[in-house]
Amino acid sequence: MAGEQTTTEYISHHLTNWTYGYLPGEGWKVAYNAEEASAMGFKAIHLDSMLWSIGLGIVFCAIFWMVARKVTSGVPGKTQAAVEMIVEFVDNNVRDSYSGTSKLIAPLALTIFVWIFLMNLMDLLPVDFIPMIAGQIGALMGHDPHHVYFKIVPTTDPNITLGMSFSVFILILFYSIKEKGLGGFVGELTLHPFSAKNPIVQIILIPINFILEFVTLIAKPISLGLRLFGNMYAGELIFILIALMPFWIQWALSVPWAIFHILIITLQAFVFMMLTIVYMSLASSTEH
């Protein structure tokens, strides 16, 4: 594919999602190119990101469900041993970092870690393999293969990463209000970090405190989502740039980068999980 397109077209093709949305003047349709996808704005859905994220979520649930069905107290198989190791790893991190009493946090952390890891893992597939298959299927259906877009790494889509981070943010707000009450939650936003014994001075400080605390609060989901997106997007872009090089150089660079990238995809899943645990712990804490 790289040989049939210019460098710019090749990179743009691999970084464009399979998008369905509302295009002004043409109605609801699948975007024919990156310009149409951009013109759709917020009235669009990235079908490939949805397909892969939901599919990998089902794979995660299916694997853990099958292991739970066949669990044995004797010598475990390789799959059971791997699942038990992951569960124990996540559980230990929750015990060490979460000070609340909710039983939701451990399953939440496990889901986040494994799901993000599986989505990140797709970045290790050859960059042209799945898009080439998608292009051939599109050609059989009468479409121009150069205008068939199919990204396979959901975490390189900010809609996915920010969607997950703002879902965590909703839980943070819920547990903050649940544990501290509405008054306590509002007090955290308006009475800290600056306080005064003089009530008039305290009233003056309320808008300042609110601005500072609100920015701190809203920065949590934004930084959580963009950190994952930025690291995975950069990793995917490097793989694409390597694919543009001569064949003999590709192997010399792609293998070391893929080995190093295994650390990145695992680390990013771990960081997202740990920050979720810490944020939920802070939300459940009655101390400020």
From Swiss-Prot:
A Pfam family reported for this protein in Swiss-Prot or TrEMBL: ATP-synt_A
GO molecular function: proton-transporting ATP synthase activity, rotational mechanism
Gene Ontology BP terms: proton motive force-driven plasma membrane ATP synthesis
Transmembrane segments: 47-67, 104-124, 157-177, 199-219, 237-257, 258-278
CDD domains given in the database record: ATP-synt_Fo_a_6 (cd00310)
GO cellular component: plasma membrane; proton-transporting ATP synthase complex
Predominant cellular place of this UniProt entry's protein: membrane
Task performed by this protein: Key component of the proton channel; it plays a direct role in the translocation of protons across the membrane.
Quaternary structure and partners: F-type ATPases have 2 components, CF(1) - the catalytic core - and CF(0) - the membrane proton channel. CF(1) has five subunits: alpha(3), beta(3), gamma(1), delta(1), epsilon(1). CF(0) has three main subunits: a(1), b(2) and c(9-12). The alpha and beta chains form an alternating ring which encloses part of the gamma chain. CF(1) is attached to CF(0) by a central stalk formed by the gamma and epsilon chains, while a peripheral stalk is formed by the delta and b chains.
This protein's name: ATP synthase subunit a
Organism name: Psychrobacter cryohalolentis (strain ATCC BAA-1226 / DSM 17306 / VKM B-2378 / K5)
